């Protein structure tokens, strides 16, 4: 049986979030939470929150045992970009693109 949790429109670059997602893919939930706790990245906080939401979904809606859960799949998709302008010399401006991410975590029992 599988359980999923999704966090959308997170203000972190998908490229940077995928680096942290690769750390927990395939791990037991308890190990993944420990890894994320000591990961000094902004995306680590977002993935930690999404993982805890998936665990709560498993406990409350499916009555699954938390000790047997592992991260079956985790992926980070690209969200919409915020477009901002930075003033430059001689009246010019350059575009700044601020990325956002959608994080999906799927847990399963071993």
UniProtKB/Swiss-Prot annotation:
One of its GO terms (cellular component) is cytosolic large ribosomal subunit. GO terms for molecular function: rRNA binding; structural constituent of ribosome. Transmembrane segments: none annotated. Keywords: Ribonucleoprotein, Ribosomal protein, RNA-binding, rRNA-binding. It holds the Pfam family Ribosomal_L22. One of its GO terms (biological process) is translation. The keyword RNA-binding applies. The keyword RNA-binding applies. InterPro entries: Ribosomal_uL22, Ribosomal_uL22_bac/chlpt-type, Ribosomal_uL22_bac/org-type, Ribosomal_uL22_CS, Ribosomal_uL22_sf. This protein binds specifically to 23S rRNA; its binding is stimulated by other ribosomal proteins, e.g. L4, L17, and L20. It is important during the early stages of 50S assembly. It makes multiple contacts with different domains of the 23S rRNA in the assembled 50S subunit and ribosome. The globular domain of the protein is located near the polypeptide exit tunnel on the outside of the subunit, while an extended beta-hairpin is found that lines the wall of the exit tunnel in the center of the 70S ribosome. Part of the 50S ribosomal subunit. Belongs to the universal ribosomal protein uL22 family. NCBIfam families: rplV_bact. This is Large ribosomal subunit protein uL22. It comes from Syntrophobacter fumaroxidans (strain DSM 10017 / MPOB). The gene is rplV.
